[in-house]
């Protein structure tokens, strides 16, 4: 009888614990429509984001991953026609699969992740300056609207050139203008 009661109690506790288990992160934004990309994006967000944390905290976790979990590889992408949804999705998927890519791919993945998290996000093209070289370098990064405020994300620059990578996380115009140039009329 004691064994039966203990088994019953263990079963009740197991069911109760399963009901109390933390729910996975559920992003607020919509997917891209590319099934493979959307599955990988959701899996990554569920790995990186805390369902109990606020949006900015989770954006920080995603940004930190982009700064440290992706390797820069100098390649060329044909962006002469702009960042169409097809190009953005293709670059983002390739970067997720290989974990290495150029600034275009990093900007594409950043935009896809931010959109999936419920933020407006668009890729911006321009140039940046390195401290050791006055020659402008062609570059791409992301402008987003987070909680109603416009800000900039550049995990490639932050992770490779900045003294403090977080300087390019939700950066304001003044911060970005120190190192980046873009067509402000396009904003």
Each language-model region and where it sits:
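Hydrophobic/aromatic-rich core segments of domains that either
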Residues: 105-174
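Active-site nucleophilic cysteine motif
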Residues: 58-62, 99-114
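Short, low-complexity, Pro/Ser/Thr/Gly-rich segments in the mature regions of secreted, periplasmic
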Residues: 176-187
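Secondary-structure boundary elements
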Residues: 31-97
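Sec-dependent signal peptide cleavage junction
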Residues: 15-31
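Positively charged n-region of N-terminal signal peptides that target proteins for export
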Residues: 1-4
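Bacterial N-terminal signal peptides
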Residues: 8-16
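A glycine-rich, coil/turn loop motif that links secondary-structure elements
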Residues: 9, 81-82, 100, 129-133
